[in-house]
Amino acid sequence: MFKGLFKKTKYISLNPERKTELRSDQNDNKSNKPHIPDGLWEKCDSCKSIIYAEDLKKNYHICHECGHHFRIGAQERINQIIDEDTWVELDQNIISENPLEFEGYSEKVDKLQKKTELKEAILTGLGKINGQQAVIGAMDSRFLMGSMGSVVGEKVTRAIETGIDENLPVIMFTASGGARMQEGIYSLMQMAKTSAAISKLKDKGLPYIVVLTDPTTGGVTASFAMLGDIILAEPNALIGFAGKRVIEQTIKQKLPKEFQRAEFLLKHGFVDKVINRKEMRNKLSHILKLHKTKQPSRMLDGNDCSYYSSKDASKKASAKSVEEIRQQGKKLTPYDKVKLVRSKERPTSLDYIDNIFEGFIEFHGDRYFADDTSIVGGLAFLNGLPVTVIGQQKGRDLQENIYRNFGMPNPEGYRKAVRLMQQAEKFNRPIINFVDTSGAGCGKGAEERGQGEAIAQNLYTMSSLKVPIISLVIGEGGSGGALALTVADEVWMLENSVYSIVSPEGFASILWKDSSKAKEAADVMKITAQDLQELQIIDKILEEPYQDASKDGQAMSEIIKNNLLKTLDNLSKKETNDLLTKRYEKFRSIGRFIEKSNLDSSINQ
């Protein structure tokens, strides 16, 4: 086992002349290596690939191998986003003081000004994105890590005030290590100053769009970076308030790799969308178009309760009367309809959104806790008209249903919906809701996060939103989970959809202690579109092609679209006070009771 352990090692000795000769050969080899100019190649921090610098620039400074987004300077970012020759820089001549007389600060600023050719850590100005004018700010992390001192705070505030004065949207690209320590309390106060300016911008009804880039941290995160109407982010960007190492030291735990990254914030409800840098220009352009305040004058006339079959678009089915549709709908039993709308073949909210609207862009998150995938929502065009679209989304197989929580929204879903609806009011966009849920999500977590409060806030908020709202039950309309999206000026149901206080199974279980009597429960609950129109709970029934929307989803979409166009055209002509009064009276009038007169009451006593 120990054989040879203490055996003497044999060495080869070289005379001094030979050593000198070998060193000379090594030096010659080094001098013969090809010289590579500085800046010719770049190394990816993520996958360690070596990339030709010119190729990297052509690819928007995105690694060809792994998609890693390199950090870029403010001027480079502006050049990537705006139309050529449209940039007009604002406030070029504001430069930093040294308010605390901090040793070496002024010299450091001077040095960085020469090195970066920037005067401060942000550029602001006016520019066009695909022809659309905006105020744009871009931070540069090369300049004192993009930290916010008096100059950065002032330039951000002036940019926002320019947006207010010129009636323009404001777009801010953030890249910052946070507050500028060398300016002390002056730096801290910039957080309040910039946030107050954004409040004034929002009062004016102008869009504020933020793009979070790597890194966005500290005081910038805790002020103007997280106050956007729409918050976008580049992939894998570091975004957070406290540093990861500080948190780990405090809680004595190792945090996951994805912690404080863009995708982490998307999952937790604080980012609307993560967008590849190559797509950023067109996405921003699209969002700006969706926020134009002037509505298009051209609106197509809707053809009420008629449809074009996608199988034979040249043949238009004759419009049927309300009574014909009502009688046709009675051919199936209530529980037959329950089973029909639960079919995995039934068109979902996203199916209708894709068929009816143009340019739908989905936004995520409740800005409090998470994004709920059982509710989808965002902006789109309806025949050129910007609208807010929200839908409860089920899955078609087990995996998708698990991802969508079986179409049963949690509090985050309802809070996301109300956030999008409040934005619709701010920017004067009609709201269209697609309802399809067996009910709100129930569970320990949902209750801990306030499911009841979330639904209540939706009902409260929707009752007074100053824009038209149309809600359409396309499948199941289950209890408060459905009602949370149906406080609307018009409530419609597809011919075979159902809308109820609880599922038939739940009704039978509660009242008869036997969930197997669901069919009998459905018969007495008055849950069909035909029942609810007779009870004056809903406003309209939309005929399903071939008496089943799943047989021709495209035709069903055309019916919905025609009705939406016609109704929105009518609703948009109403004065706001009239719209709100009629919405209030609509729900105020619902209820059945007997009220005895004072005389009857005294006799009974």
UniProtKB/Swiss-Prot annotation:
CoA carboxyltransferase C-terminal domain ranges (all copies): 317-570
Entry's Gene Ontology cellular component terms: acetyl-CoA carboxylase complex
Acetyl-coenzyme A carboxylase carboxyl transferase subunit beta: annotated segments: 1-269
Region (Carboxyltransferase): 40-570
Domain CoA carboxyltransferase N-terminal: 40-306
Cellular compartments annotated: Cytoplasm
PROSITE patterns linked: COA_CT_CTER, COA_CT_NTER
Segments for region (Acetyl-coenzyme A carboxylase carboxyl transferase subunit alpha): 270-593
Protein origin, superkingdom: Bacteria
Cofactor(s) needed for function: Zn(2+)
GO molecular function per UniProt: acetyl-CoA carboxylase activity; ATP binding; carboxyl- or carbamoyltransferase activity; zinc ion binding
PANTHER family the record matches: ACETYL-COENZYME A CARBOXYLASE CARBOXYL TRANSFERASE SUBUNIT ALPHA, ACETYL-COENZYME A CARBOXYLASE CARBOXYL TRANSFERASE SUBUNIT ALPHA, CHLOROPLASTIC
Family from the record: In the N-terminal section; belongs to the AccD/PCCB family.
Record note on quaternary structure: Acetyl-CoA carboxylase is a heterotetramer composed of biotin carboxyl carrier protein (AccB), biotin carboxylase (AccC) and two subunits of ACCase subunit beta/alpha.
Protein name (database record): Acetyl-coenzyme A carboxylase carboxyl transferase subunits beta/alpha
Species whose genome carries this gene: Natranaerobius thermophilus (strain ATCC BAA-1301 / DSM 18059 / JW/NM-WN-LF)
